[in-house]
């Protein structure tokens, strides 16, 4: 049986939503016909890594992320985090919302849940799982990029060849392109590198980061 998502796919996030829902194929005729470069639009919809901006706490920062073209917007719902949000803010259907939890997922009404194990009160990124409707759909690898160890890249790339990987850890406008080239992840995630203070985003850095992901 072939499951086809027939309509309404105009953004990379919508294509990812169809994929995560179990679609084997999507119809994107109108989106391609309206695009100046159909081949470029097809690659945009189907193949490039998703860009996630996480640690959002303010409506103006959510708007800046969406205006920049972010595919995923993340809200940390762990009270102990310096980037804790009171709730997941509304997100249009052109993007996907992600609730970030430590220990177990609650019910935030988001498209995805990102659940980290609790270890001494800290998020342990390598053990994170992405859930859709309670079902695992991918992993988060939070790698220590500040350490000059090529093995990190190689191990992450090996995992990314077998399953959906969201890559995180020190990613920002200046580092995300190299990470994408080395690992070929399903998505990339940035938070602290896009801030002026915990939970307060720098809109220019958000834009530069998303542009680097799309480059």
Regions found by a protein language model. Give the residues of each.
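Short, aromatic/basic amphipathic alpha-helical patches
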Residues: 17, 87-92
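Catalytic cores of alpha/beta
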Residues: 5, 9-28, 58-68, 103-121, ...
């Amino acid at each position: 049986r072939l499951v086809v998502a027939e309509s309404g796919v105009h953004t990379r996030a919508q294509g990812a939503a169809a994929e995560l829902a179990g679609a084997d194929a999507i119809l994107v005729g109108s989106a391609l016909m309206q695009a100046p470069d159909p081949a470029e639009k097809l690659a945009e919809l189907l193949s490039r890594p998703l860009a996630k901006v996480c640690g959002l706490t303010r409506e103006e920062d959510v708007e800046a992320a969406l205006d920049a073209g972010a595919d995923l917007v993340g809200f940390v719902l762990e009270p102990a985090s310096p980037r804790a949000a009171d709730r997941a803010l509304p997100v249009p259907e052109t993007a996907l919302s992600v609730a970030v939890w430590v220990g177990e997922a609650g019910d935030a009404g988001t498209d995805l849940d990102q659940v980290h194990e609790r270890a001494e009160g800290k998020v342990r990124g390598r053990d994170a799982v992405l859930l859709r409707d309670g079902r695992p759909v991918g992993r988060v690898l939070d790698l220590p990029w500040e350490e000059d160890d090529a093995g990190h890249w190689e191990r992450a790339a090996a995992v990314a060849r077998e399953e959906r990987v969201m890559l995180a850890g020190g990613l920002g406008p200046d580092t995300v392109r190299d990470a994408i080239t080395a690992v070929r992840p399903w998505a990339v995630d940035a938070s602290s590198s896009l801030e002026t203070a915990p939970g307060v985003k720098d809109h220019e850095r958000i834009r530069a980061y998303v542009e680097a992901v799309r480059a």
